[in-house]
Amino acid sequence: MKVAILSGSVYGTAEEVARHAERQLKIAGLEAWHKSNMSLEELLAFAPDAFLTVTSTTGMGELPDNLLPLYSEIRDRLPAWSGKPAAVLALGDSSYDTFCGGGELMRELYAELGLREVVEMLRLDSSETVTPETDAEPWLQAFVAALKA
């Protein structure tokens, strides 16, 4: 199964988590692909069977600048991905009202596209974790199990 990993990061933590997720999915026998700043054309060329987004939140609950162009392009073109499995791993700081707002935007987009959320969005709180890659592993295992089910 081909899994595309979309990522958006302000300070690099979400990128690290996305790279870690790519390694974990490959170890599990999936064909995972992650590229920072990917274009919609690159994503379509990969022809994913499933989607994983790893993103932080910036500003007033917005997506980071490096994910926003892809998000906008997907919203404009609405590719035919209905029924495909997807999940979102969001990083944020719970001291803000817009905690994990970037992840919520991706969940809404996935719902608009008709993608199936196979595991509930994981919200990693930067005020509670210093090892988000490790903290994400049980959730990633659940994501892999859902994809293989």
PLM region spans:
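FMN-binding flavodoxin-like domain, especially the glycine-rich phosphate-binding loop
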Residues: K2, S7, G12-E16, Q24, ...
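Short acidic loop-to-helix transition motifs that present clustered carboxylates
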Residues: K35-E41
